[in-house]
From Swiss-Prot:
Source organism (scientific name): Fervidobacterium nodosum (strain ATCC 35602 / DSM 5306 / Rt17-B1)
PANTHER family: ATP SYNTHASE SUBUNIT B, ATP SYNTHASE SUBUNIT B', CHLOROPLASTIC
Annotated S-S bridges: none
Metal-binding in keyword set: no
Compartment annotation: Cell inner membrane
Highest taxon in the source lineage: Bacteria
Name this polypeptide is given: ATP synthase subunit b
A single Gene Ontology CC term: proton-transporting ATP synthase complex
Its membrane topology: Single-pass membrane protein
Transmembrane feature ranges: 10-29
UniProt xrefs under CDD domains: ATP-synt_Fo_b
Gene from which this protein is expressed: atpF
Leader sequence residues: none
Family: Belongs to the ATPase B chain family.
Amino acid sequence: MDFFEINLTAVVQLLNFLFLLWILNKLLYKPFLGMMEKRKEKIEGEIVEAEKLRKQAEEIKKNAEEELKNARIRAEQIIASANSESEKIVEEAKQKAQKEAEKILQNAYLEIEKQKQEALAQVQTIATELAINLAMKVLKGTLDEKAKREYLAKVIKEYEK
């Protein structure tokens, strides 16, 4: 019968233990879960933002490629125009027509190259900035400084290709 008797010390210890669990739950566990949920929501928001930035970068790249294509078409039109003009001038004076056609073609090629270089530089600058912003938002607070730098270097190398 001693086995089934209630030991007052054991009951008090059990109540103290339950009270301690309740305190720990209120003071540590619930705030910790709340903090983790906020962090999860923040990361999910940053992932959504990163996806938006990636889509914007793709749109900018697409627009730059379209501008480059238009520049090539314009250059071809300039070249075609220069060729027809040079044919007319050749009829009047062969020497003068040949020099003028070469000058027009040279200017057209220089303009094409200039526009091409500007478009490529613009695309690379925008893509690099977006990649850095994207990486910084995604990596903010999740990696140590060395890991951030290595990841950023990797992203920049990929965009430079």
